[in-house]
């Protein structure tokens, strides 16, 4: 499968899932983007079109992390969950953004669940 086909396939999956997945202030959308070497996660309130909080593997506190990419993703998930719980957010809607629930995405989700987020 060529790179163009992969990108268009992911975009189709993303568009289909965005119809069903909607975040509010009480239950925001946990949107995850995975690049080749980094991972980015943010909580989004779709009603107001605002990003509530964001964390990534590029953050200052995460740049010095050692280990595999999956281990770093678990730490990022835990950090996001701790920040959300501090703001009083306990439940979220998980938006995998067209990516398969596997590997680094799964590690981030499990880290967030371990830290107390419900989805």
From Swiss-Prot:
Give UniProt keywords alphabetically.
Ribonucleoprotein, Ribosomal protein, RNA-binding, rRNA-binding
Gene3D superfamilies, A to Z: 3.30.420.100
What's a Gene Ontology MF term here?
structural constituent of ribosome
**Alphabetized SUPFAM superfamilies for the sequence:** Translational machinery components
Task: Name a biological process GO annotation.
Answer: translation
- For whether the record's keyword set contains Membrane, the answer is no
Recorded hits in InterPro entries, A to Z, give: Ribosomal_uL18_bac-type, Ribosomal_uL18_bac/euk
- One Gene Ontology cellular component annotation held by this UniProt entry: cytoplasm
Read off the Pfam families from this record.
Answer: Ribosomal_L18p
Region feature Disordered, mapped onto this chain: 1-20
- Can you state the subunit structure given in the record? Part of the 50S ribosomal subunit; part of the 5S rRNA/L5/L18/L25 subcomplex. Contacts the 5S and 23S rRNAs.
Q: What does this protein do?
A: This is one of the proteins that bind and probably mediate the attachment of the 5S RNA into the large ribosomal subunit, where it forms part of the central protuberance.
Name it. Answer: Large ribosomal subunit protein uL18
Species whose genome carries this gene: Chlorobium phaeobacteroides (strain DSM 266 / SMG 266 / 2430)
């Amino acid at each position: 499968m060529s790179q163009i086909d992969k990108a268009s396939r992911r975009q189709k999956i993303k568009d289909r899932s965005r119809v069903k997945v909607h975040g509010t202030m009480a239950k925001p959308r946990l949107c995850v983007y995975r690049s080749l070497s980094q991972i980015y996660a943010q909580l989004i309130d779709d009603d107001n079109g605002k990003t509530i909080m964001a964390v990534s593997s590029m953050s200052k506190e995460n740049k010095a992390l050692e280990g595999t990419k999956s281990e770093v993703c678990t730490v990022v998930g835990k950090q996001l969950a701790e920040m959300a719980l501090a703001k009083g957010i306990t439940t979220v809607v998980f938006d995998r953004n067209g990516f398969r629930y596997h590997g680094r995405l799964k590690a981030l989700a499990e880290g967030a669940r371990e830290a107390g987020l419900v989805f």
